[in-house]
Amino acid sequence: IVDTQYLGALADQNAAAREKAAELSDTAVPVRVPTAVVWEAYTGLGNIAFESDATALRRLYERLLRSHSSLEMTPEVAKRAGELNGTQMNSDTRSQLDGADSVVAAHGLLLGEPVISNDSDFRDVEGLEVVTY
């Protein structure tokens, strides 16, 4: 399950992220992008000062997104993400998850698939496998 942080690293041509992408393409492991990640990435596009820069990044995101299947936010995912977000917020010891991160984590937990991210907040989610690069 792709996190926004990893998608951004791929867009930035991060060597470690590209190496992980090549490694994953050689396996039968599905690489999926939650629609919450698409929303978060495009929110970033809306914050770019120069339209030419936003257009270039939009094209890159479109290319990256075409190469992966997407995961919709179903009611089941929304419920799991909401409970997870509340649990993390109520904890004195666990990292806080933003809204998109709780959705990404919920997808990983419900599907039993790892999340690809260097975001340390995911490490505090009980039962979630996190793959770093």
List PLM regions with ranges:
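Short, hinge-like loop/turn segments at secondary-structure boundaries
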Residues: I48-S52, Q88-N90, T132-Y133
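Hydrophobic alpha-helical core bundles mediating ligand binding, dimerization, or RNAP-core interactions
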Residues: G44, Y61, L65, L84-N85
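A generic structural signal for short hydrophobic patches within well-formed alpha-helices
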Residues: L7, V38-A41, A78, F122-R123
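Histidine- and aromatic-rich ligand-binding microenvironments
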Residues: V2-D3, V33-P34, L97-D98, D119
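Short, structured coil segments at secondary-structure junctions
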Residues: T27, R66, V125-E126
